[in-house]
Swiss-Prot record:
Organism per entry: Aethionema cordifolium
Native organism taxonomy: Eukaryota, Viridiplantae, Streptophyta, Embryophyta, Tracheophyta
PROSITE patterns in UniProt: RNA_POL_BETA
Gene3D superfamilies associated with the record: 2.40.50.100, 2.40.50.150, 3.90.1100.10, DNA-directed RNA polymerase, beta subunit, external 1 domain, DNA-directed RNA polymerase, subunit 2, domain 6, RNA polymerase alpha subunit dimerisation domain, RNA polymerase Rpb2, domain 2
Functional note: DNA-dependent RNA polymerase catalyzes the transcription of DNA into RNA using the four ribonucleoside triphosphates as substrates.
GO molecular function: DNA binding; DNA-directed RNA polymerase activity; ribonucleoside binding
NCBIfam families, sorted: PRK00405.1
Family of the protein in this entry: Belongs to the RNA polymerase beta chain family.
The protein, known as: DNA-directed RNA polymerase subunit beta
Catalysed transformations (reactions): RNA(n) + a ribonucleoside 5'-triphosphate = RNA(n+1) + diphosphate
Subcellular location: Plastid, Chloroplast
Protein's GO biological process: DNA-templated transcription
GO cellular component, one term: chloroplast
Amino acid sequence: MLGDGKEGTSTIPGFNQIQFEGFYRFIDQGLIEEVSKFPKIEDIDQEIEFQLFVETYQLVEPLIKERDAVYESLTYSSELYVSAGLIWKTSRNMQEQRIFIGNIPLMNSLGTSIVNGIYRIVINQILQSPGIYYQSELDHNGISVYTGTIISDWGGRLELEIDKKARIWARVSRKQKISILVLSSAMGLNLREILENVCYPEIFLSFLTDKEKKQIGSKENAILEFYQQFSCVGGDPIFSESLCKELQKKFFHQRCELGRIGRRNINWRLNLTIPQNNIFLLPRDILAAADHLIGMKFGMGTLDDMNHLQNKRIRSVADLLQDQFGLALARLENVVKGTICGAIKHKLIPTPQNLVTATPLTTTYESFFGLHPLSQVLDRTNPLTQIVHGRKLSYLGPGGLTGRTANFRIRDIHPSHYGRICPIDTSEGINVGLIGSLAIHARIGDWGSLESPFYELFEKSKKARIRMLFLSPSQDEYYMIAAGNSLALNRGIQEEQAVPARYRQEFLTIAWEEVHLRSIFPFQYFSIGASLIPFIEHNDANRALMSSNMQRQAVPLSRSEKCIVGTGLERQVALDSGVPAIAEQEGKILYTDTKKIILSGYGDNTLGIPLIRYQRSNKNTCMHQKPQVRRGKCIKKGQILADGAATVGGELALGKNILVGYMPWEGYNFEDAVLISECLVYGNIYTSFHIRKYEIQTHVTTQGPERITKEIPHLEGRLLRNLDKNGIVMLGSWVETGDILVGKLTPQVAKESSYAPEDRLLRAILGIQVSTSKETCLKLPIGGRGRVIDVRWVQKKGGSSYNPEKIRVYISQKREIKVGDKVAGRHGNKGIISKILPRQDMPYLQDGRPVDMVFNPLGVPSRMNVGQIFECSLGLAGSLLDRHYRIAPFDERYEQEASRKLVFSELYEASKQTANPWVFEPEYPGKSRIFDGRTGDPFEQPVIIGKPYILKLIHQVDDKIHGRSSGHYALVTQQPLRGRSKQGGQRVGEMEVWALEGFGVAHILQEMLTYKSDHIRARQEVLGTTIIGGTIPKPEDAPESFRLLVRELRSLALDLNHFLVSEKNFQINRKEV
């Protein structure tokens, strides 16, 4: 959050700021911290010493540009150089050298990294903060059992529990527990020191048995007892140095390393003053924790809420990158040790650069970005998706929770989330509540806590001085925080009015003079996705959640349009997404076309700005920039030069404002189906472009290299018509399903017996050598028809021209809206296109205009998303008045029914200015009498007509529709595979069989269960009779699924004999059965 110079005012932070700050913290602090931990490495004879110097490091500017890295599938990274020294102890000479230790992927202006040509983003993770937490549970007798859980930095746990006899046990796993006296003694304290450092020594003495006195008599005995319990070892182990090392490694390092944050939390919770650099659990911590546990048992102290954000920490980009850098340096340490030993063995003179290789660092980061669950491919469906993806918070991932084990309490909204984590925006399905989104103004503090800004109101003069504070979740517990802002109060009687406030996780109504802090912005509690929903306060939260997710699935349209009713954040989202081209300096436009814009700079310098042209996103949507400035125009810094996909004039534009009616129409909008006019198809209103990538690789086989060629034997010329002389499809070609995109032959060895008779005859008589190559061309799959817009030939480094590594073909498709496509509004109102009506058959208004889309009115009351009605009516008023509205949420705090008053007043004004009384009829405001396009008769009831903002989603029928005539079968069940990608079949399940039985279609049912499914012999006979002709024989034995059941029962030692009853042998002897 940035103050803008005036006290008490602020601007919205950059939406990518969280990512930028994290990466900067890693480069500025994390790198130095990890290099400083790198140990001095000596050889076996301790004659040579190698070390890294932390004072200076250098990151070199990348050798390639971002765009080239994407185009050539390379990593956009910087070379890291550090100073290293090699010291010969005998002569005390030191050789210092700046060495290259590897490449670090850089973050670009979108907050993402480019690895192997793919945009990847690192998600922030929420973990339980290391420290100690006191909780209470009821045992089987209904008695409260108090426990204190110490969580280490790596997620290991050590539990302290107090039983009904006031004995304290330390539980190192679910089964083993030992006395706290034994644990303290194993950590180095004797009985006298233990009793001196606790508040209740008499309680500790009360449960000291003779056996425990013997165990804590010496440190060795205590360590042996602890080792026996911890490792579940039987017999009598003998004390040794290796036993101590094993215990140190397995227990004290894994479960007792608190880290910086853990040490701070334990000091605060237990009122200790141990230095922050002491990051391991000490005996003093254990004893202080035991004292607090005894206090809990006797009613002193407060229990901890594990789901409160003060007990969580954010593992940010900086932490994840720093962990990987530390891992790479640990691998580098092993490499250096091995290299020093090898150099001395072969009597070579080492230098610092010779000892170090760049492989550990480079491979560590490549595997992290490629395999780590928190490193994800950037979703680039539209500009909003890019922004929102980087602001996600996940409970999942290493050290976190899983969707199966997380309980409802963890997933639920907590009062401490307000202003930090959006209570609306989360994923649907198994991960609901586990993947959240940052609130707009939230930021990550130095200690990994989420901070939210508030205005502080001073006691003496609350009007004159206002200061902005950032508070962590533990700090705002002690303040009365007003939920609204001061505009909601009448200036004259401000002090007398009551305001809603939050205090200690409760929501109260208090007098204005008691308020300490107030929120700074109406959208402060919401994420970006939720903040783009107008009239969100009139919607049910579940529908707002769906809307937040569906806006991210909107497809950029060929002709974008700004929303009439918005919230005001559309411009900020578009600018921060990096989709529009923005002027970096002021100047004059010298030249502009679809490829580039040339701008005059300072002096005689010119600045060329390349534009993105028909670039594919990873969701196959089209990224394209259109220039918005003309030649000769003078521009200022920050001005929009070109709009990108789904932006207009620098504002987010995901959908279209279209004329909608809420009414039933012949059942075609039953159950959320949507009826549309053919105008939306022929007018290209919802037309979008999609770009698909098809890729083929060439390999060098044991028989020789694969060849790219146009000369493909045994293929029709029609399929090869689009190939050039090299065997690659030509740019601009129109290709259909089955066409060859790249011709490729793979060499193979053919035995004499494998040749066809005519091939052997040609070889014997004419001496013609028959081709031994197999055709392995790249063919266009089903549904891939379109125009070839780009072909990329990516060769290996140093490779020859006939052996390229990859060939990529990009094909553009133009898709109009059609039956089966999914559309949605911004209030969770979604539906599938059920029918496209001719324009003349659509219902029409009193001025003759036909509506574009018909929604079902029954979808509104039960879903409780009334915001769509407000938006619909206000959109109609805006289109008639040529106005755009930007409305903040919760406007009812200014006065009652504020939203309704605004909408009705705008409709009334539109009715007056356009002289159309039907726009606002006082008897049924917002509704209008409309006419049936087929008959011209008016409908019985007035209907709500308006112009909401409707999006076309990426769930399109072209990607979903699928049919199977033949395909693969599963090996075990012999049934067709599942899924479109595997050319699978449709499963006839239990309920489908009931439906077929209900209509008595016995033959169809038999075919579904035998020929078309898993009867091996019957389906082969079907193929034979189809070719030869004749009737298809009925199957006489059981299908494979029944045989499988029998085999599974036999594996359980249950033998099942079966026989088939048919019409012929129906009168069978029962004794035979």
